[in-house]
Amino acid sequence: MSLSETATQAPQPANVLLEVNDLRVTFATPDGDVTAVNDLNFTLRAGETLGIVGESGSGKSQTAFALMGLLATNGRIGGSATFNGREILNLPERELNTLRAEQISMIFQDPMTSLNPYMRVGEQLMEVLMLHKGMSKAEAFEESVRMLDAVKMPEARKRMKMYPHEFSGGMRQRVMIAMALLCRPKLLIADELTTALDVTVQAQIMTLLNELKREFNTAIIMITHDLGVVAGICDKVLVMYAGRTMEYGKARDVFYQPVHPYSIGLLNAVPRLDSEGAEMLTIPGNPPNLLRLPKGCPFQPRCPHAMEICNNAPPLEAFSPGRLRACFKPVEELL
């Protein structure tokens, strides 16, 4: 089965699969409204991978939850998100369930809490196919085995009869990837996919995702704080801070020529294996309280390049084709 078999609408021009415009997520709290995502914009084409990076509380996961219709009950959403030319924000529940089943899938951070501990893994995989694809039990079993084989699960047929607690963390994550891909989605959202895994298993999972992306032409949104993960798989990078876009561009550009002080700080904080004894760098201070954001640029209190003009909010502007940033500091002074 190919991805084209699940398409229900014609793609947008230039093969744009997902287009997000002015996405805004606000939560009502006893202390006031909290804006977790503030006017986010990006596009994603079939087969592309977008990395959304930033510290905890930057709005990465809430962006994904908004697209999936999984916000908490006190959340409100604004803006627009079109998938295959169709607006998907605030869809009726039935249409949203169909979309999530057949076209968009999400892998959550902790596979142990995402899998039902009382059901065999095979039953959980088969349930997806029987419910959403109308397969018989026998057909669903064989297709589930094929997908476990596709994600390099050893002894896949035997593993179908096992419970989640009998798997290692890396194997459980492979099960979640297999489950997410069963319906051949056009878009896969991975939220902190490798956080709980050791470095060796992380590398295996990243290699696997790259292979599956090529095989199924699936677009991926990779939500992570691990810049190594982004470097290994992503085509484009969106750097978020306090719910806003700080920088956006091709991954190689953001990594080799970052043009926002926050992006530079994140990259400088990555430990280097080629500099033995080098000082470990950090970004001073803490992420802001979203109820009491600083005036102007939210990164200003922590920024080594802060100027008086930073008391005003910098607009997100293009400074070269395909690259955006929100900063008053001249680009040439940061390179």
Per-region residue spans from a language model:
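Conserved ABC ATPase "signature" region
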Residues: 87, 139-158, 267
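Short catalytic/signature loops enriched in Gly
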Residues: 13-16, 154-158, 248-335
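A short, flexible loop at the N-terminus of ABC-type nucleotide-binding domains that lies
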Residues: 13-17, 26-39, 70-76, 92-95, ...
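Conserved ABC transporter NBD signature motif
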Residues: 76-87
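ABC ATPase NBD coupling module
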Residues: 74, 88-105, 123, 131, ...
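A short, proline-enriched helix->beta-strand linker immediately N-terminal to the Walker B motif
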Residues: 182-186
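P-loop NTP-binding/switch modules centered on Walker-like glycine-rich loops
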Residues: 69-70, 189-193, 197-278
